[in-house]
């Protein structure tokens, strides 16, 4: 354990704690040092953004009982892959038609508290000429926006990636706020088969922290998402070890950047074996490992944990979420799903106008199932075989 003097002398790490196998965030210097450091951080955070009260209110609204997030922020290229799967061309009109179907589903706001949009969607209108943002707000759904600019190779790493998009982020987030967005999302990834290297983990954590600070300064609640990819043959213990170290580093840099924890949301991966592992985990095992991770690494000041599905089947993602809500948690534990909400809906629609109502009914059924899972009341009865099919894609890009 490092001494207090070492912590004071080295406020900025020049060598990742990943390498040392320790986390500065959870060290315990003298009580006086903790009080002074916390007091200084608290004062800095409150003064850093004039949106502090609004950020807390927005985060609590999204983290409301029985509701979660609809992630519909796929890039136009990824949206094109989805459309291609049902025989449609990747045109703005077709993207608009599917997004209209999603945001205008009657009663969606009963189960969904927030919707993450791609930039095109934030400025887009429905096929009826109404702004997508306005349609969401009318359903009591908070509009959000994807702000990262995607993954690029991380030079000097073991074939790993880093997330770009910090350049110009302050002006973009300010514009997104004016357009009606109230929260933001930044997705970076960690690959277990490729290490992960200390460099990749530190880069991911630092980028998330800078994005979070900038977003809060513009009035947007940042969703912090270091996705640990499902790729690999590793067991659940290996996933846990990596996740524990990743989240330690993330929170260390969030604190360094004076990010207000009450005004953020997390979007973690569930702790599962690698998708190519011979071992499979039950929902109870996934819940046990995941909740242990959260309790060891996530401060209770964070209002909401909104899990990503990461290629799990629709049913698997819902069952795992339900298992995590069988006992009280210090945070709102819910969902932020894309494919695990949209997949069956997309196939039901098939690009045909006459199928819109049926597709919306399918979307609502999936959203309701996850709403029940957030309350710990999902039974899994009546699920189709299609909803049980896994959606893992090796090397998946978003």
Swiss-Prot record:
Query: What highest taxon heads this organism's lineage?
Result: Eukaryota
Q: Tell me, what is an example of a GO biological process annotation in this record? A: response to abscisic acid
In the UniProt record for this chain, what is stated about the effect of gene disruption? Reduced growth rate. Unability to accumulate starch in leaves during daylight.
Q: Where does substrate bind?
A: 95, 185, 309-311
Q: In which tissues is it expressed?
A: Highly expressed in rosettes leaves.
Q: Does the keyword Chloroplast apply?
A: yes
Listed under catalytic activity are: beta-D-fructose 1,6-bisphosphate = D-glyceraldehyde 3-phosphate + dihydroxyacetone phosphate
Q: Does the keyword Zinc apply?
A: no
Q: Which residues form a coiled coil?
A: none
Q: How is it modified after translation?
A: Can be trimethylated at Lys-394 by LSMT-L. The methylation level has no influence on the ologomerization state or on the kinetic properties of the enzyme.
Class of the enzyme per the UniProt entry, highest EC level: lyase
GO CC annotation terms, alphabetical: apoplast; chloroplast; chloroplast envelope; chloroplast stroma; plasma membrane; plastoglobule; thylakoid
> What induces it, per record?
By glucose and sucrose. Induced by drought stress.
The biological pathway it contributes to is: Carbohydrate degradation; glycolysis; D-glyceraldehyde 3-phosphate and glycerone phosphate from D-glucose: step 4/4
Quaternary organization: Homotetramer.
Q: Which PANTHER family match?
A: FRUCTOSE-BISPHOSPHATE ALDOLASE
Entry similarity comment: Belongs to the class I fructose-bisphosphate aldolase family.
Give the protein's biological function: Plays a key role in glycolysis and gluconeogenesis.
What the entry lists under NCBIfam families is as follows: FrucBisAld_I
Please identify the protein, giving its name as recorded: Fructose-bisphosphate aldolase 2, chloroplastic
**Taxonomy-wise, where does this protein's organism fall, top ranks first?**
Eukaryota, Viridiplantae, Streptophyta, Embryophyta, Tracheophyta
Give the gene symbol. Answer: FBA2
